[in-house]
Every structure is written in structure tokens, then in C-alpha cells.
């Protein structure tokens, strides 16, 4: 009850009494994952990360979880239908009543259209799609220093967010790893694929007057401040 009151007061105090539903778009290393956590806490909305959702369904040991695990372990991509079904289940959950924050979804124009239909069927109005823009040189520096704890999905950075003990997860003490594709040449290929897939998604949201661009070259706190200002402005326009 105390948590609910604090959440209600925060939303009332800052004039955000309505639902806030957002999509975050950005390449790996753009900082959207870091900002997603801050946004979800700030507005008390449901953070839907496809990576977290897929890890959870695998951990459940269900028939679907075993199917997803086989796909991911073989290096395949989980189908749009499976991802959208899992997203739909989360959308309907009570903890998402204040709004939704989509992180890592949609990744293709087909997913964007499916998400649009999912929200429309539930009479949910997407407030905005936030695109994280940053210089390629900064992106390379961020990506190539990343460290991961595979079991939990926690991430660190050798320069910007190092673990307490080098190459060791702060919580479990497990060994951290570099992703094999977090190297300059592999990164170029990933960004080429990202740009190819994201262009129609950006056009899709821009045609709906929902696309807002974020200068992700700035530090974490300034980026978060800019996001809050954009959300305030967009909410005012929607009234």
C-alpha cells in the first residue's frame, strides 16, 4: 500500500496521471538499457525487455521455454509470433496498468506493425518512440569495453561501469565475459544490419508523429533529463 501511494503521489506531483507507453529504439551501446531502468522507475511503468522475457520463459522450464532455449542455443532467431505472444501476456498483467516501456522490441517493421495491433486491440495509445542517436566513434568505445554476466544478463563496462573486481560479477562472483561480436569488425556488420532493419521502423513511427530523437552522446544524467523533458512536452501535446 505504501509503495502504491508513493507511486501515485509521484505521478500526480509531476502531472503524469495518465498512462505512459513508450518504445525505445537504438543500436547496442546507445545506453537505452540504462535509460530504460531509470524511465521505468521514474514513471512506475512496466519495463518490457525481450531479452529478460526470453530468459524468464527459458528458466520456467515450460514446453515453450524449452523450445525457445533450443532456438537460441542453435543461434536462431525466435519467431515474431512467439515474441509477440510473450509480449501480449506481459501487456495484460496487472503490474503494467500505469504504462509500458518496450526495450529491444520492435526490432523489425513486422514486429512494429504487430505491436501496433496489440496495443490498438487493448485501446492503449503509444505516447512516443524514442530514438537514441550517437556518434559511431563513441558507440565503438562503449561496445568494445562491455562485460556480461551470462546467467542474469547483467552488464558492465571496463571504463564506464567496471565491476568491483576485474572480470567478476558483483553479485554472484561468477566470471564475466566479452561478447565475441563486441569487436570493431563485428560491430560494423551488426550496425549495418541494425540500420537496415531500423530505417522502416523509424519511418513507421515518424509517419504517426510519434518519433522523438535523443542525443545519446551526452552523459547518463543529461540524457535522462532530456527524456523527461520530451515526455512532459509530449504529454502536454496529448491533452
UniProtKB/Swiss-Prot annotation:
<dbReference type="GO" id="GO:0006756">
    <property type="term" value="P:AMP phosphorylation"/>
</dbReference>
<dbReference type="GO" id="GO:0005737">
    <property type="term" value="C:cytoplasm"/>
</dbReference>
<comment type="pathway">
    <text>Purine metabolism; purine nucleotide biosynthesis.</text>
</comment>
<feature type="region of interest" description="LID">
    <location>
        <begin position="145"/>
        <end position="182"/>
    </location>
</feature>
<dbReference type="GO" id="GO:0004017">
    <property type="term" value="F:adenylate kinase activity"/>
</dbReference>
<dbReference type="InterPro" id="IPR027417">
    <property type="entry name" value="P-loop_NTPase"/>
</dbReference>
<keyword id="KW-0660">Purine salvage</keyword>
<feature type="binding site">
    <location>
        <position position="146"/>
    </location>
    <ligand>
        <name>ATP</name>
    </ligand>
</feature>
<keyword id="KW-0545">Nucleotide biosynthesis</keyword>
<keyword id="KW-0808">Transferase</keyword>
<keyword id="KW-0963">Cytoplasm</keyword>
<keyword id="KW-0547">Nucleotide-binding</keyword>
<dbReference type="GO" id="GO:0005829">
    <property type="term" value="C:cytosol"/>
</dbReference>
<dbReference type="GO" id="GO:0046083">
    <property type="term" value="P:adenine metabolic process"/>
</dbReference>
<keyword id="KW-0067">ATP-binding</keyword>
<feature type="region of interest" description="NMP">
    <location>
        <begin position="49"/>
        <end position="78"/>
    </location>
</feature>
<comment type="similarity">
    <text>Belongs to the adenylate kinase family. AK2 subfamily.</text>
</comment>
<feature type="binding site">
    <location>
        <begin position="76"/>
        <end position="78"/>
    </location>
    <ligand>
        <name>AMP</name>
    </ligand>
</feature>
<dbReference type="InterPro" id="IPR000850">
    <property type="entry name" value="Adenylat/UMP-CMP_kin"/>
</dbReference>
<dbReference type="Pfam" id="PF05191">
    <property type="entry name" value="ADK_lid"/>
</dbReference>
<dbReference type="InterPro" id="IPR033690">
    <property type="entry name" value="Adenylat_kinase_CS"/>
</dbReference>
<dbReference type="InterPro" id="IPR007862">
    <property type="entry name" value="Adenylate_kinase_lid-dom"/>
</dbReference>
<feature type="binding site">
    <location>
        <position position="190"/>
    </location>
    <ligand>
        <name>AMP</name>
    </ligand>
</feature>
<feature type="binding site">
    <location>
        <position position="111"/>
    </location>
    <ligand>
        <name>AMP</name>
    </ligand>
</feature>
<protein>
    <recommendedName>
        <fullName>Adenylate kinase 2</fullName>
        <ecNumber>2.7.4.3</ecNumber>
    </recommendedName>
</protein>
<dbReference type="GO" id="GO:0006172">
    <property type="term" value="P:ADP biosynthetic process"/>
</dbReference>
<feature type="binding site">
    <location>
        <begin position="104"/>
        <end position="107"/>
    </location>
    <ligand>
        <name>AMP</name>
    </ligand>
</feature>
<dbReference type="GO" id="GO:0006166">
    <property type="term" value="P:purine ribonucleoside salvage"/>
</dbReference>
<feature type="binding site">
    <location>
        <begin position="155"/>
        <end position="156"/>
    </location>
    <ligand>
        <name>ATP</name>
    </ligand>
</feature>
<dbReference type="GO" id="GO:0005524">
    <property type="term" value="F:ATP binding"/>
</dbReference>
<dbReference type="InterPro" id="IPR006259">
    <property type="entry name" value="Adenyl_kin_sub"/>
</dbReference>
<feature type="binding site">
    <location>
        <position position="179"/>
    </location>
    <ligand>
        <name>AMP</name>
    </ligand>
</feature>
<dbReference type="Pfam" id="PF00406">
    <property type="entry name" value="ADK"/>
</dbReference>
<comment type="function">
    <text>Catalyzes the reversible transfer of the terminal phosphate group between ATP and AMP. Plays an important role in cellular energy homeostasis and in adenine nucleotide metabolism.</text>
</comment>
<comment type="subunit">
    <text>Monomer.</text>
</comment>
<dbReference type="GO" id="GO:0016208">
    <property type="term" value="F:AMP binding"/>
</dbReference>
<keyword id="KW-0418">Kinase</keyword>
<feature type="binding site">
    <location>
        <position position="55"/>
    </location>
    <ligand>
        <name>AMP</name>
    </ligand>
</feature>
<feature type="binding site">
    <location>
        <begin position="29"/>
        <end position="34"/>
    </location>
    <ligand>
        <name>ATP</name>
    </ligand>
</feature>
<feature type="binding site">
    <location>
        <position position="50"/>
    </location>
    <ligand>
        <name>AMP</name>
    </ligand>
</feature>
